[in-house]
Amino acid sequence: DYPSYSIPIKSNSLTFGYTLDNLLYDKLTFDISRGEKFLIVGENGIGKSTLLKLIMGELNPIEGEICVGEKTNISYYAQEHEILDLDKSILNNFSEYNLRDYELRKLLGSFLFSGDDIYKKVSVLSPGERSRVALAKISLSGANTILLDEPTNHLDPMTQMIIADTFKEFEGTLLVVSHNLDFVDNLGINRMLLLPSGRIVYYDRDIVLHYEMLNESDE
């Protein structure tokens, strides 16, 4: 009976690789509970972002399946910022939400945009500024499930904490790919999926620190 209202996302014996000779996952099984804050960690290149793309249906498994419940409405923050219209201003990227001017300015202010900054075209923004615009849109999406793929890339430490505070208050299901200890420490993570082993453990900051140090040494 999966997925159900209480289990919005479930992976059942998922096998995937870009080639049959180099599988990223072999019979990976896990489920995510409604309202849970769930973290995916592992070494660089191990398939963390790929798993989110499988959940979104952008890739197809070789065997097994990822099931998403019919009532699961997902908003997906990808590193490519595909939800942004580069030809529009920051302000006009929010036109579909029908917010009053003061409401939108308040929201953008909470993501560190103020004054005439909101009239800048997204195409001229820095990578960090684009990230902030995309995350602001995610926060407004009305989705009951949010996927965040490395949301702190290009963000300074102060901004990272602001973003963490925003998504800590999110009452839906949150699935995060990150090895940024300071950020995930402030999200209220419940459980973690360790790749490539597929182990599920309760949140352990020492494990996150291990992967943070390991991945930084590879950069």
Task: Report residues per predicted region.
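ABC ATP-binding cassette signature C-motif
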Residues: 3-219
